[in-house]
């Protein structure tokens, strides 16, 4: 009986197919394909940020490419980003946005993404990010007298934003602007001033006639703007300097319609509003791919000095990841790896990562 059992086990082992086990490959972090996946990830960040500033790619730290059945590949990619000076509501293309410099107290993002490539198209399956300002020590090494980021709920910051917006509305011949969010602030001790940046929305009231601002409503076709102000304390008074830019609404690019469809007038929407869920999604929600996921209560923290990316990208998978075979990062044998010949002609296995730094490292 024991001999029969052993023979059965041996026959079962012979019956197992010895096909190859699919593994991952590790392309260079600066490969064209890797950069395409990274740029798709950055585009995803900027389209789903509800507040704060757009981010741009700074460096690809690592990348693994896994096969995905029934079709496509998944890029498991880690990237570093830097905050730009463009607010998320600003329709300015990212390529035209300046990176915030070290002397301005720069902010860096650190993100992990799973990006699907299928039929030449990239789509995000999973996103997890966090961001943080440069350390005070590093800022002062570069610029000893440069001001640091201040908490956005600091009473001096709130007062500066309200005073700057009130001053602008008082001098404006256009629509009354309403505060949307305070985005950034710095306390400047040498001049006893507060520098503040904030987003605004256009209302249906005329600025100089808005005697009851609470009765003013946002436009049906929402339109946003961005302001920068400085409030300087003087003896028994304060000086206020402020500039505001209202973003232009842009026409929708219509898709081809079936024959007989109603060819009405082209609707006009705010490009900045479509780039962010702020206008259409409740404050307690965020958009992740094609789905809306509730954010855990109590965030973002009250005493924040910037909008941390982790409050929008906390590792929630997109609905797209449910299509086809699920993707899981596992301990699978590697596939063919790129290599760089050594001076003696041997070919050591070298993974050319991390990639180049596009701006500066924090």
UniProtKB/Swiss-Prot annotation:
Family annotation (InterPro entries): Cystatin_dom, Cystatin_Fetuin_A, Cystatin_sf, Kininogen_Fetuin_HRG, Prot_inh_fetuin_CS
MF term (GO), any: cysteine-type endopeptidase inhibitor activity
Keyword terms of this UniProt record: Disulfide bond, Glycoprotein, Phosphoprotein, Repeat, Secreted, Signal
Expression across tissues: Expressed by the liver and secreted in plasma.
Main localisation: secreted
Entry-linked SMART domains: CY (SM00043)
Family of this protein: Belongs to the fetuin family.
Modified residues (Phosphoserine): 131-132, 135, 314, 318, 321, 323
Post-translational modification: Phosphorylated by FAM20C in the extracellular medium.
Signal peptide start and end residues: 1-15
Entry's localization field: Secreted
GO terms under cellular component: extracellular matrix; extracellular region; extracellular space
Gene Ontology terms: biological process: acute-phase response; negative regulation of bone mineralization; positive regulation of phagocytosis; regulation of inflammatory response
Lineage: Eukaryota, Metazoa, Chordata, Craniata, Vertebrata
Disulfide-bonded cysteines: 29-353, 86-97, 111-129, 143-146, 205-216, 227-244
Naturally occurring in which organism (per UniProt): Sus scrofa
A UniProt-annotated Pfam family: Cystatin
Protein name listed in UniProt: Alpha-2-HS-glycoprotein
PROSITE patterns in UniProt: CYSTATIN_FETUIN_A, FETUIN_1, FETUIN_2
